[in-house]
Amino acid sequence: MARIVGIDLGTTNSLVAYMKDGQPRIVPDRNGRTMVPSVVALADNGLIVGNSAKEHLTRNPERTVYSVKRFMGKGLADVQNELTHFPYHLTETGGVIRIRLGQKNYSPPQISAMILKELKLRAETYLGESITKAVITVPAYFNDSQRQATKDAGLIAGLEVLRIINEPTAAALAYGLQKNTQGTIAVYDFGGGTFDISILKLKDGIFEVLATNGDTHLGGDDLDRLLVDLFVAEIRDRHGIDNRHYPDHMQAVRLEGERAKIRLSDELKTEITIELPEDKGRFTRELTRDQLESLAISVIERTLTPCRMALKDAGLNPKDIDEVVLVGGSTRMPLVRQLVEALFGKPPHCHLNPDEVVALGAAVQADILSGGTTDMLLLDVTPLSLGIETMGGVMSSLIRRNTTIPASAKEMFTTYVDGQTGVDIHILQGERELVKDNRSLARFRLKVPPLPAGVPRIEVTFLIDANGILNVTATDMRTSQSQSIEVKPSYGLSDMEVEKMIEDSFKFAAEDIGARKLIEARLDAESLLKTTDKSLAEAGHLVAREEADAIRIALSQLSTAKDGTDFSAIRARMAELEQAAKHLNAVMLDDSLKRGLQGKKVSDVS
């Protein structure tokens, strides 16, 4: 069976994972980096993704897209309050957000597809095989529009999305908690842009989401903004410069704040260095962990309120929680771990990398789907998809065909008509898009109080047991009466548009890969040229003249190749330059060590 990978398509970073020897593993790039920044930029030589794109945040913020996950399955009206936070240009066409890069507009699924293509290519390069199938994770609160947009992104990227699973479920799978017979799990997910808390109930191998809560505008970015405000104020007071008038320098301030926050998870203090605009020198200061925590405490405490609300919604107390799992880079902060442990009364699981845990869990789910997990007995699968009728006579699937059973799915919905007094639930079985082409299983009607459209909160649960018996429950969260519905996205990419994008992705696959390899080779060559040229300038006197001349020749040859269109030639010239400069680099390292140890005793360094 073809390999299935697990993908964490994140707001800030994305990862791809696979199973090896029964254990989930993250796919690294050739430099050993596991995370791909969820950033797409328009450079002079075309669109770039990941680490190289992130570098454009400071140089060209208006042509660099980040946090696109916030816009998946949404229209402009849904994100009005967020528009001021993003330097790039957003428009709307046919109810779909469009992001302008250069002369073209892209939908959020198209941007996300570029990130997925990067992950797909990374996996193919590392594993040495074609990757066409994936499990992708989404936040538990993602509605059907957002889930469908994620599937669309996968299709555009040339991936068959076999399963969309909730991030908290993936985190629990990564820790192997599904091997327990039962239990209640709190998944505390403090990421870059959002905070989510999910309460899961595990019974007989089934994960059920009891409650979710959170804040879509609370994350590590808020901690970064606190540091930015601090640095901007100090720069203004000390140097008389208002960095807010310099967008590129504001990005530099933000990145330095982010780096400092990360360093202080492991260190007690760190040095801040920020280059000032208009060549007015640099701003430096020391920042301690205590200072960061005094700034961050108000933000971190805001995560505890959703936790308490989720516990209340689930009808639980903190002592009822059996396991606590941490997800997201912000949970590395010691203060976060202390407050979470204090709230739930038990130390959280944190031995797995919190940035990687969701992707690892996605790989576990992928392994289950591929039949690779031998210690789990899969009794049966659903032969046909199960879903409900939505607006326009469309079937919306909650439990997909070939889902292992027992299984459950839960979603939150609302109404579309003011004063609506009832909701008709039409349960369907089949694989076709339209209701008329599928098999009708049952109908029921639920009364709801007459409220403005969009106000009712209707929770729908599909539960199919090991005998294949389906139970559908819907609950009006205001009245506690039962109610059920799932909605086909009122906006999103049309089937024709998705198909066209898929066709184009295959039609131009070879051309796209070739162009990408050329861009990557040029970027790597530019970096190697700069570092080698600098090394030669600083330490050329430490090697023989003939050796220095050979390095200069290799530099010239690579510079010429870089301007060409043959990425293989660029890679070859890079290898030649690396070989020519190998001794120089070794001499530089040796010289640096000698100078570092000069005047010290053996006891000082032993």
Functional labels for PLM-detected ranges:
Residues 1-95, 101-105, 109-114, 121-606:
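Oxyanion-binding/catalytic loops of NTP- or PPi-dependent enzymes
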